[in-house]
């Protein structure tokens, strides 16, 4: 059976709509409650001990703006690879994740039931400017 041009166009349009909406449904942003209050509490402890000396929340507001529409995982990797400045990568993976949750919370993003995990889904969470 050979498909006509109209049939082929119809299939392409239907497939584009179906797959397009499926893709949109899977995308999350930091506005979607992608971290818990427990992560925020743990992150504040790490932030106060490791970050506060050099970085205030104004710094992070500007940082989040510069990462707008980028995956949250990229910011996590950047912070892990460069901080603390005197010993980059020296914190535990969970501590970097906790700090990210604290930074997001302090910039007005909502908590939720989801646990942030750099190995599971953080690459599909988009940063949006506060």
Question: Each predicted region: which residue ranges?
Answer:
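Sequence context surrounding c-type heme c attachment/ligation sites in exported
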Residues: 41-49, 61-73, 92-93
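Bacterial N-terminal signal peptides
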Residues: 10-20
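Alpha-helix C-capping/helix-to-loop hinge sites
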Residues: 61, 82-86, 106
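Bacterial N-terminal signal peptides that target proteins for export
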Residues: 2-12
């Amino acid at each position: 059976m050979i498909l006509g041009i109209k049939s082929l166009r119809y299939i392409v349009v239907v497939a584009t709509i179906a797959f397009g909406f499926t893709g949109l449904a899977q995308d999350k942003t930091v506005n979607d409650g992608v971290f818990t209050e427990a992560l925020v509490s743990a992150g504040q402890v790490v932030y106060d001990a490791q970050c506060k000396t050099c970085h205030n929340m104004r710094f992070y507001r500007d940082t989040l703006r510069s990462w707008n529409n980028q995956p949250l995982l990229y910011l996590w990797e950047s912070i892990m690879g460069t901080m603390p400045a005197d010993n980059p990568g020296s914190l535990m993976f969970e501590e970097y994740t906790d700090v990210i949750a604290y930074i997001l919370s302090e910039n007005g993003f909502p908590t939720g039931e989801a646990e942030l995990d750099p190995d599971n889904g953080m690459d599909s969470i988009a940063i949006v400017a506060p």
